[in-house]
Amino acid sequence: MKRSLHQVFMAITLISASFFSQAAETQTSTWQHIKQTGELRIGVAQGEPWYFKNPSTGEWDGIGYNIGKELAKDLGVKLVTVETTWGNAIAALQTGQIDTMLVLDPTEERKKAVDFPEQPFFWYAQGVLIRDGIAVTNWDDLNREDVKIGVTLGSSPDLILTKRLPKAQLVRFPNMDEGVAAFYAGRVDALSYFHPALALQQAKVGKGNLILPKPIIEVSTSGAIRKETDQTFHNFLNDEFAKLYKSGKTQHYYEQALKLRGVDVSKVPSVIKEDWK
């Protein structure tokens, strides 16, 4: 009997210890966790030029990865990459698997689940990869019945151009690869997506001109973090984004990622919106 009571007591003690340990971990802020472990954990997901993994070495590269290295250096900790997907990044943050997911747009829906610094990480614009021979300065120049524009079905560019260009023929593809193939084959006159992705596709097909029609449709991206009372990491990320943006390092790592794919960066709009004239 005494032995049974002792076993019950020990079981309760272990359960209580586990409960309070988990509670303590839950209460530990991102900043505290980084300092205690000496690690900054960033989510990484395939998607150039933000992140890409070298199949030969297994090493990650891209603007998101390299800015992650800068953050870890300024924190005085080790950078740890945690592979995830764009769709699972929010859940990975909420469950404490990662400390931040860089290059995640601060949409209103995402803001309900996670936090974002006020300072944008960088900017991109809705661009157009247009075939040679078509002069375009403004979006209105594309609002013609004789112009076929390829877009990815259901994407932001699709939704925006459906309203902005009612006269143009929008040709919708299930993914960008099919749109690029159609552009290369001459089945569409232009492709519209955000300009960093178009820069990579232009380098692949070796055709067309990449432009940002006016008025420029701009979108900021950021770094998602957990919602928490302790705002230390939030404020750190806010200050770092501002510093790296103004110093030119953000643009440097963007260009570096494009150069790895043979892109002539002198012909590509930057991710610094003040450069867009």
Predicted regions and their residues:
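A structural signal for short loop-to-beta-strand junctions that line the ligand-binding cleft
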Residues: 31, 62-64, 111-122, 210-214, ...
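Extended ligand-binding regions for polar small-molecule ligands
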Residues: 62-74, 134, 140, 155, ...
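Flexible hinge/capping segments at coil-to-helix
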Residues: 130-148
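Short helix-initiation/N-cap motifs at beta->coil->alpha
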Residues: 80-91, 136-137, 171-185, 219
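Ligand-binding clefts/hinges and TM-proximal coupling segments of bilobed small-molecule sensing domains
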Residues: 24-28, 156-171, 241-277
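Extracytoplasmic small-molecule ligand-binding "clamshell" domains
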Residues: 24-104, 112
